[in-house]
Every structure is written in structure tokens, then in C-alpha cells.
Amino acid sequence: MWGRGFLQRARFAQLSPSSSSSRSLLSAASAAPPNLLYSHYQRGRWFGCSTANMAPVRDPNTLSNYDAWRTRHTTANLKIDFTAKCLRGSVILELESQTDKASKEIVLDSSYVTVNSIKLNSAPSLWETKARTEPNGSPVHIAVPEGAAKGEVVKVEIELATTDKCTALQWLTPAQTSDKAAPFMFSQCQAIHARSLFPCQDTPDVKSTYDFNITSPYVVVASGVPVPDETKDLGEEKLYKFQQKVPIPSYLFALSSGEIASAPVGKRSCVCTGPNELKASQWELEGDMDKFLEAAEKIVFPYRWGEYNVLVLPPSFPYGGMENPIFTFATPTIISGDKQNIDVIAHELAHSWSGNLVTSCSWEHFWLNEGWTMYLERRILASIHGGDAHFDFSAIRGWKALEEAIKEYGEDHEFTKLCISHKGIDPDDAFSTVPYEKGFHFVWSLDRLVGRENFDKFIPYYFGKWSNKSLDSYEFKDTFLEFFSAPEYSDLKDKIASIDWEGRFHSTGLPPKPEFDTSLADVCYELAEKWKSKDFTPSPSDVASWTGNQVLVFLNAVQDFEEPLTVEQSQALGKAYGLSESKNAELKAAYYHIAMRSKDASAYQGVADLLGEVGRMKFVRPLFRGLNKVDRELALKTFEKNREFYHPICRQMVEKDLGVSEAANSS
């Protein structure tokens, strides 16, 4: 056991990035064997000081000891280096002690980050990066020899640089952008990728306020409110500052930089995107942003984040949208020229309450974020479009997606549960429609059980009680039961007692199917029935008055035929309704699934072309799986051609879908 004197003489520990288990090098004792200070280290113990009596962490996807220390504020002083394709600089974490000097170390999550030095309260600190374990990365252990009194805040300053293995960042060359003039970068930290930007407590169970001080030669966007008065010109670069005063989890840390222009689209909103896309993006979104905000505020309570803006990213962005606060990061597939795909914005806006303000404590309870958000999204859209028929119409589409996801996994698969065990599981591997739609159906079932008028009173109560906090499924259950235990709801006692909470949380497969209002979908089903006859002659007028979503429901119904269309029918479908030439990626992708099921080889190259234009996983993964079944050679060729176009998260998932992970990793 090494005493205090030796510790005080040791100046700092430095990471050797080439080492699989990074070594601590002591400048005051360079002759000491590697890891000498850690030879007697055990988790929960530093120099004989036990933390065994502390409450356990409840997130299996973090290696941090956030039960002993909690990040309260984060300052990111980072330079965006487009030449080296990395972020470099320092991050300062202000951590509050949760014990009375019982913990003698801080443990942070990290993944493929080069750490150059760490200071504790401005003084060099002992630290070590431990060996990597999948899927959670390499924990960074920082000595706090004297511990800290309960409630005391310590500052940890980390000098660092990201590496080429960073899973949170995508770097685009000028050629990969529309105007071909400048490079572009953006981050995607959900689920556990913030740790590849900087060591942190990378768990949704910890929330921090943020200061962003970001230097770049191009415009910067971050998940905070811009502080334009403090932007500084540094010659070829500028320092951009943002503040996030509402505490957020690490997965909502977001950065983007490039040739970005902006335009107003509402009283509290602007759209940001490439200069070439600005006019089309502004047209697509203006007129709806204020409506979405006002509708959401009536359902929950006033928006607490100040601004609500949208950054429309290049095509390789892997999601429909990412609910980064202040600036939703959105796929360009929503800019379809017909305002048919902006439901995504209603969804991401709803996250301002469900997910961002009130957060699931771990990815095992992800449905609390997404199920609630689907519910709020549908309430928002129903209030704008005029009634429950629109709510049910969207829910019908969601049920179809849920059926497909569960069919893909299998009825008894762990990932078809609401509450999923994530021990040893990468949350990205468990990502699917299930937490969205199965979660929605649970929330909606509670709404129907107690009645809309009563449920509408519960909504602001729930979001008010858990604002700026994180919770698990059982805390949600307790909150629901607490609210409806009030005397005025005594007539609901028997109904509430009938809720099968355990079954809802832990049963695999589909939930009970509700009775949908099919009034907006019936016409779609009627047209689909006509396509079962090989003698049917289609006409563009069949769908001329329909919304894009009605066309999508029709296509989904055709896709479900027991007997696929013939090649001739498939080609007639694409031609008559203009699907293969559509600018709407939703419709185009749905049509290509029908064509592949029909074995229409003339459509396969169109599938490959679309896969080179869109990086959104909602389209990319199913299309690759479909193409792989009918033409594996083309699927592999298409993936290799576009490998660098896809975001690292998307690329990794497609590798698994195509069964090329091992080959790719060994090459």
C-alpha cells in the first residue's frame, strides 16, 4: 500500500495510446514498474478506502461510479480539426461527491479517446485507463486521495483528442456535401458514444449543464443556446460559444460544423443546413413549427428550452432525427418537397419533454423515452390535423412497423420486451421499433383505461414531477398509481388494479391489439384489394388525392400479400404511381421492398442507387437485408462502395446484417 507522501511526490499519470491497457507513468518516479500504484487496486477501493456500502449503479452500460460522484456541470473547450479529423482540447467536469469521503477515486467511461493529462482541482492527478471490455469501453480511473465531503464539488480537467476509431463523429469531405465547397462534421452520441468524444459519466442516469467553447474554421452548431455576442474571430477560425442551462444526459451532447446557413421558420425557430438546401428546407418547415410548439405546450406545459431549431444534415445521418436540445439534428429525407415527412419534427419536438426533460435512467427502460414520445407526437399531429382519426391512422402505420420488427427478431426474443436486459449488450444492437411502438401502445392503453380527460391531467403531473431527472419503469408505475390514488379517481380503482404491469414490462412479442379507427385507412385497403387481381389496371388518379402516408399504408398492405405481385404488376405499380421516381424516400423504399419480393430484377439497381443516396438506418438496414436475399453480390458490392458514406453506427449495424463483421474487422 502506497502512502500519502509517495502520492504527493507523483506529479501525474499519462496515457500511452499504443498500450492495450494504458500505463500510468509517474514523472517523479519514472523508474517504478508500470502500473505499480495499481497493483493492489480493486474496483471500489483506492489505497484501502472502501466504497462497498454505496448504493449500486442501475445502468449496466456504464463503467463509471456515478453512485459516488455525479457530474453537475461540463465545460467543453474543443477545437474541430478537419485536417486530422479529430476534436482536441480539454473538458472540465464538475463532480459532486455523493459520499462523505468514502470514495477515493472517480471512474469515467471512455472509448478510443487519447487522454494526455488529467488534473484534479487544478493539480496534476494520478490516473489510469484500464483495459477495454466490450461493449462499454475503457474506464478511466482518477485518484481522489482525500476523498470529498458529501455535496463537495471537485473539478476534473482532461486534455484529450479523439481518434480515428471515434464512433460518435462522422467526417465528410467537400465532395460528400451538396455544394462541394467545404468539409462537414457531425456527432451522434446516442446511445453510448459520448464516451468516444471525452471521458464522462456516459449514462442517461446523470444530467449535467454545459458550456460549449468550440473553435472551428466553419460555422458551429451545438446542443445549447448560441451566445453570439461572445463569438470571437481568431483569424482563419472562430470561437463559437453555447450554453445549456437545463441539465442533460451525455447522449444529448452534440456538435456539427461546416458550411451552414440559417433561416427563420417560426417565432422561436430557425432551420440550419447547407446553403444549397436552405430555401427548400425553409419552405418545408415554415408554417408548421409554431403549430407544433403550441400544440405540444397545450398537452404538457410550456416549452422550457428557449429556442427550438432544426439542423438538416447531409444524407449520411443515420436517424430520422436526433432530439439534441435547441437543435434537432434531422435527416434530409424529411425535405421531400411535399411536407409529407415532417412528422419527424413533431416527434423530435415531443422529446423536449419525454426523453430530454424526463429521461429513462438506462437503455433498459428506453421505452419511457420513445413510447411517450410517440404518444405525444400523435397527440400533437391529431390536434393540428383535426381529430382522433389522424391519431389512429398514425398508430396503424406504427402497428405495421411493430409487427415487422417482432417478426424480424422472433416472438420470444428478449429485444421484443419493453424492459430489456442490457447486461453485456450494446444498446445499438437492441435498437428497433419495439420501444417506440410497444411503448406507445402501453401509454395509449393507460390513456384509454382511465379516460382522456383524466389522463390529460396526469401528463403534466408526470412530466413536472420528473423534470430534470431520470427514472425507471417501476418509478413510472409508482407515479401513475400515486396520481390515481387521489379520492377523485376512486371510481377507477378496479380498472387500475387490473393493469398487468409485470406482463407489460417483461412479456415478449406483440402487445394486445386495440380497435383502431380505420376511417382514413379503409380507402388504402380497398385499393390494395384491387391489386390482388392480375387484371387490375392502375391509374395515377387512384392515389392523386391521397396524402403520402395513405400511399404508404397502401404499399404496406400490398407488401403483406400472401402471394407477391408478379414482376409485371410490380413494374406497373411503380410506373402508374410514380414511385420509383418519387422524391419521398419513405414511398420509394416501400415500393422497392415490394419489387424485391416480386423478384423484379430490373429494380435491384434502383435499390442500390437509393442505398448510395440515403444513410438513414430506417431505410438502409431493411433495404440491405432485402437486397441481400435476392442479390447478395450486389448487396455486398453496394455496401463496399458506400462504406465510407455511412455513419460509423450505421456501418457497424449493416456489417452485422450482412454477416461481414468478422471479415471487415480482420481486414
UniProtKB/Swiss-Prot annotation:
Its main location: cytoplasm. It comes from the Eukaryota. InterPro entries: Aminopeptidase_N-like_N, Aminopeptidase_N-like_N_sf, ARM-type_fold, LTA4H, LTA4H_cat, M1_LTA-4_hydro/amino_C_sf, M1_LTA4H, Peptidase_M1. The active site is at E348, Y436. One of its GO terms (biological process) is peptide catabolic process. Its cofactor is Zn(2+). It is found in: Cytoplasm; Nucleus. One of its GO terms (molecular function) is epoxide hydrolase activity. GO terms for cellular component: cytosol; fungal-type vacuole lumen; multivesicular body; nucleus; NVT complex. Zn(2+) binds at H347, H351, E370. Keywords: Cytoplasm, Hydrolase, Metal-binding, Metalloprotease, Nucleus, Protease, Zinc. Its EC number is 3.4.11.-, 3.3.2.10. It catalyses: an epoxide + H2O = an ethanediol. The keyword ATP-binding does not apply. Binds 1 zinc ion per subunit. A peptide binds at Q188, C189, Q190, P318, Y319, G320, G321, M322, E323. Belongs to the peptidase M1 family. Aminopeptidase that preferentially cleaves di- and tripeptides. Also has low epoxide hydrolase activity (in vitro). Can hydrolyze the epoxide leukotriene LTA(4) but it forms preferentially 5,6-dihydroxy-7,9,11,14-eicosatetraenoic acid rather than the cytokine leukotriene B(4) as the product compared to the homologous mammalian enzyme (in vitro). This is Leucine aminopeptidase 2.
